[in-house]
A protein has these predicted regions:
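Short helix-perturbing small/polar motifs within transmembrane alpha-helices
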Residues: 2-32, 47-53, 57, 61-141, ...
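Non-cytosolic membrane-interface motifs at loop->transmembrane helix junctions
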Residues: 33-37, 80-84, 145-155
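Hydrophobic transmembrane alpha-helical segments of multi-pass transport and channel proteins
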Residues: 154-163
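Hydrophobic alpha-helical segments embedded in the membrane of multi-pass proteins
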Residues: 38-46
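Intrinsically disordered, low-complexity regions enriched in small/polar residues
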Residues: 19, 43-44, 155
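Hydrophobic transmembrane-helix microenvironments that flank and shape a buried ionizable site
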Residues: 40-41, 52, 154
Length: 181
């Protein structure tokens, strides 16, 4: 039964990624430098939320969603580059979470996850994601301007994550309080 729930998390995370990336492209297409790296990249925030909540299953869902969009030529027509970028889309938030837990920012069960801790984690996530994706692009011969791409990717991940995190917070603040009895 647990495997069934975990597969459900993977599928829903992947579908949410596809939907949010499509929405992101529609809304921000006039401002983006490329389809995969924009000034505001909302799926990065989704990855952070899903990996915080569902750990490796959220990471797997992010990678699957990125792969689905990549195979639709969002990233490139090169399947190896697409697969690598998809893996990194799931790996970056998972790696950031693991680093923050290891550095005692918060516990595995999210005890101690404060607003300032979440902000530091968001900045760390944007840096890790930007660095991993830019290194992958350079390794695949598609890096172009390394520092410009790194700055753009970092900014897009950071702003996208902040938009998603604050949207989730706003939603949670306005949900009716559930009774505990």
């Amino acid at each position: 039964m647990q495997l069934h729930k975990n597969l459900w998390v993977v599928a829903m995370t992947a579908l949410a990624y596809v939907g949010l990336l499509s929405f992101n492209q529609f809304i921000f297409s006039a401002f983006n430098a490329s389809a995969a790296s924009g000034l505001v990249f909302l799926p990065g925030g989704l990855g952070l939320v899903c990996v915080l909540l569902f750990v490796e299953w959220g990471s797997l869902g992010m990678a699957l969603g990125a792969l689905l969009m990549g195979m639709g030529s969002v990233y490139t027509d090169d399947p190896i580059t697409t697969i690598g970028a998809a893996v990194l889309s799931g790996l970056a938030p998972w790696l950031t979470r693991a680093l923050c837990v290891r550095c005692a920012e918060f516990d595995e069960d999210l005890n101690g996850l404060t607003a300032s801790c979440l902000l530091r984690m968001t900045v760390a996530f944007a840096a890790v994601s930007a660095l991993l994706h830019q290194l992958w692009s350079v390794a695949r011969g598609q890096g172009g301007d390394l520092w410009g791409g790194l700055a753009l990717h970092f900014t897009g991940q950071l702003l996208g994550a902040l938009v998603v995190l604050y949207s989730v917070k706003l939603l949670l603040d306005h949900l009716p309080r559930l009774s505990r009895g």
